[in-house]
């Protein structure tokens, strides 16, 4: 999370929010290639790398998935989300209760047929800025693990 210093930047003053959001730590991801070649199935292509990063992060920092209010991915879509949850379970990590996906927040999979994800850069930036940062600043959420797939 990017920090927000209200005294210097005025960030959040317009709506009365004063809580600072800070980066607590990072884990760098790695490429995990399961050989998915279908450009319309980006969720399945990105889920293995997301799983590897989440599991590595939790191990590196000595944390359980429940430490985070939300574990947020970019745009795996509903297909990729199911794969991610299954892969994490296989590695002994249950994220089923606190995983959310920015693409699933931004789009309506039922009416827009967006099941496999793909627009992770746009979804990550937009939903982090417009949805998660305000919830962190207000204190509604305390900690998120942000994995911008």
Regions found by a protein language model. Give the residues of each.
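Conserved catalytic cysteine-centered active-site region
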Residues: 1, 17, 90-130
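Condensing-enzyme catalytic core mediating Claisen C-C bond formation in acyl metabolism
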Residues: 2-55, 60, 97-104, 113, ...
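Short His-Asn-centered micro-motif
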Residues: 74-75, 147
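Short glycine/threonine-rich loop-to-helix capping motif typified by GTGT followed
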Residues: 76-91
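Short loop/turn motifs at secondary-structure junctions
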Residues: 64-67, 140
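Glycine- and other small-residue-rich loops at beta-strand/loop junctions that grip anionic moieties
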Residues: 39, 73, 117, 121
């Amino acid at each position: 999370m990017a920090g927000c210093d209200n005294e210097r930047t005025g960030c959040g003053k317009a709506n009365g929010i004063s809580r600072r959001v800070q980066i607590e730590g990072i884990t760098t991801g790695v490429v995990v290639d399961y050989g998915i070649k279908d450009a319309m199935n980006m969720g399945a292509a990105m889920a293995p790398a997301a799983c590897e990063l989440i599991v590595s992060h939790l191990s590196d920092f000595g944390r359980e998935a429940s430490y985070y209010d939300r574990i947020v991915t970019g745009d795996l879509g509903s297909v990729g989300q199911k794969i991610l949850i299954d892969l994490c379970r296989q590695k002994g990590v249950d994220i089923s209760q606190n995983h959310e996906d920015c693409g699933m927040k931004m789009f309506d999979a039922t009416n827009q047929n967006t099941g496999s994800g793909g627009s992770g850069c746009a979804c990550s930036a937009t939903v982090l800025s417009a949805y998660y940062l305000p919830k962190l600043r207000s204190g509604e959420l305390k900690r998120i693990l942000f994995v911008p797939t």
